Amino acid sequence: MLIKLFGKIFKNSNDRALKVINLIVKKINSLESTIEKLTDQQLSSKTIEFKNRISDGDNLNNILPEAYAVVREASKRIFNMRHFDVQLMGGIVLNRRCIAEMSTGEGKTLTSVLPAYLHSLLGKGVHIVTVNDYLAKRDANNNKPLFEFLGITVGINLPGLNNIEKRNAYLADITYGTNNEYGFDYLRDNMIFNENEKVQRNLYFALVDEVDSILIDESRTPLIISGPIKSNSDIYYKINKLVPNLIKQEKEDSENFQGNGHFTIDEKSKQINMTERGLILVENLLIKNHLMNKNDSLYSSKNISLMHHFISALRAHKLFFKNVDYIVKNNEIIIVDEHTGRTMHGRRWSDGLHQAIEAKEKVNINNENQTLASITFQNYFRLYEKLSGMTGTAYTEAAEFKAIYKLDTIIIPTNRPVIRNDLPDLIYMTEKEKINAIINDIKNCYSKNIPVLVGTISIEKSENISNILKKLRIKHNVLNAKFHELEAEIISQAGCPKSITIATNMAGRGTDIILGGNWKSEFFNKKNINKKRIKKIKESWVKKNNYVIKLGGLHIIGTERHESRRIDNQLRGRSGRQGDPGSSRFYVSMEDNLMRIFASNRIIQTMQKLGMKTGESIEHKWITKAISNAQKKVENRNFDMRKQLLDYDDVANEQRKAIYSQRTEILNSLDIKDIIDNIRKDVLKKIFEKYKTKHSEKINVNLIKIENLIKKYFCIEISILSLYKENKCNLEKLYKNILIIILKKYNEKENKIGSTNLRIFEKNIMIKTLDSFWREHLSSIDYLRQGIHLRGYAQKDPKQEYKRESFIMFENMLYELKIEVITIISNVKIKS
């Protein structure tokens, strides 16, 4: 509903925004002739002038027109590149806490230098966020000469840097890095024991490249720093061997339905559901293989984990596939991002799924991990004071950007009209027929020297097509997660005549495909290059460029429709950049996952009624619309899932912010004596509140309980009954007098140890205990979340129940934390 409503009002609001933006562009253009007359020295000194104006109370919006005019002029002098008006428009949008949708080839990298320079003037730090290390290094090194000419420093934040190198990267005016590295640095900064080890400054402005990929596609996978916990790896191997005994039960409306299966598969949510027959069989198998005692129940607390392992093993075999969801490399399981096709090194599936897949593939099983710190990208990027982003495809997700990140999306017009020919989908009944048609299309283009980019949704499918082309002796390149290192080089040459490139999803995103190939890369990779040689290379490229243009440009082949229209649009957008010609066509079969899982049965029945012959395709508006509706259905479902993830994570996020804030306060404090004093009072007060009673017959019993707890927590021997009588049976007075005794003893300890030593000890204990209890709490709320959906069967709202219970758990954790801190500090022994 939200998405439909958004679509109706989007066009009008976009047009209104562009009218206002155009007025600012005219103002920037009016300054060009004046700025052109400045010497290099005068131009670069404008940065100091702008900073002085800010110090005097001026704001960025007032400075923007002149600042952008200065950057444009600097770009002309340093790069021999002048910002187009549409790039200025993009830069203005990015200053507005918005997302700029800019088509492929429109120069997003050059656009980004405008808001980056403007915000660097505040000296708070600008973070430019890219999807991989290659793009971070490339963009930082490419833009560095321009920024340095204007007196702005540039840092690159890469994995593997030490603390000093990272801190220096963050201290630069503008820092380039990946979303993963920024997020992990934030988590690591909240695990340090010395404030000097912190690398990040306060999070001010993040400019996210390929914003849809980072804030939407990757938002469901949290960043996790974890540590191993002891676990029995043998159990995974043993249960893995039992999986073949179980039979899948078909859906009731299926012609294969017999009702004798052991489990059903929900492909939409990637879940396994056990049938009653299945549960009985699992119980018998576990007993037979001595994994469970004969008289035990599968549902007892000590055996419930066995059922969990069995479900994980079934998911590993039936829902997660090699070269689709993961690859096996160097005896290790590496996850493949379902949206980008890239490998996700260092990421592991949770809940024992990763170990189950390791058992399935017969590789070494790593221990299950305990979460030490975690955060989703949704919550990390919402920590920034100001956030904006750019991408070639944001419109279809505009409602989500607005709902979750409060970011408006503005579509920037192209510098030149898009003349790409987007051909209608060709729909086949079977996968085999579809693949044959795709191969024929490739052969036809190859014979005419037309460059082709073939987009697939998995490594497995890209390699299937590659194997067929090898048999046909058609030269081609394969670009998938297995060949990540060659990604940019392969994709940059995909526009050469006769070039056939097969790529998973949007691998190579961020690198333009130039018709005729990338002539610059030819001399970058060669030694002893001279101007004469460069001229020859460029002349050769011009001929190839003109030749490919005459052929009709780059041809895009989509081997199936993706779950998201946005991913399809990204693939199409690789062709037809900067007014170049191009074409695209998607091939669909009724056996594709999208059609099989999400399309209605009516479509399949209609296709069957048409009586299509083998190899015959159909082009029909109704079918194309049905495919689009299936995609919208999936997009809405995925949006709901991400929104639900955020709703749950927001609960943990509020607790995370409270813990991290307290931790930072302790780290920054030289003396936490006041904090310890307050903890001491709270613990003692809670003891008295717990055993406070008006019944005289219970008072003596309760006083003894108070005495025992005081001895345990505060390491003090007192006769509380005597003190109670001395204080005329007044509990309030008793509390105050005991507090005085506790403080007196602690002060004696301080005199022996020395104040400085005791303060250091208190601080270390406080931080270590806080970290330990927070880790345990993360595990506890994770377990709570995994089972909270069961509350729905009791007519309770799982989300509200999760909020309520996690709050109680958090409150209890904080009190237990106080007890632990005071117990350790009070019980410390002083050695002579």
Swiss-Prot record:
Its EC number is 7.4.2.8. It is an enzyme of class 7 (translocase). Pfam families: P-loop_SecA (PF21090), SecA_DEAD (PF07517), SecA_PP_bind (PF01043), SecA_SW (PF07516). Signal peptide: none annotated. ATP binds at Q87, G105, E106, G107, K108, T109, D512. Keywords: ATP-binding, Cell membrane, Cytoplasm, Membrane, Nucleotide-binding, Protein transport, Translocase, Translocation, Transport. One of its GO terms (molecular function) is ATP binding. It comes from the Bacteria. SMART domains: SecA_DEAD, SecA_PP_bind. It is a peripheral membrane protein. It catalyses: ATP + H2O + cellular proteinSide 1 = ADP + phosphate + cellular proteinSide 2. PANTHER family: CHLOROPLAST PROTEIN-TRANSPORTING ATPASE (PTHR30612:SF0), SECA INNER MEMBRANE COMPONENT OF SEC PROTEIN SECRETION SYSTEM (PTHR30612). Belongs to the SecA family. Monomer and homodimer. Part of the essential Sec protein translocation apparatus which comprises SecA, SecYEG and auxiliary proteins SecDF-YajC and YidC. This is Protein translocase subunit SecA. It comes from Wigglesworthia glossinidia brevipalpis. The lineage of its organism: Bacteria, Pseudomonadati, Pseudomonadota, Gammaproteobacteria, Enterobacterales.
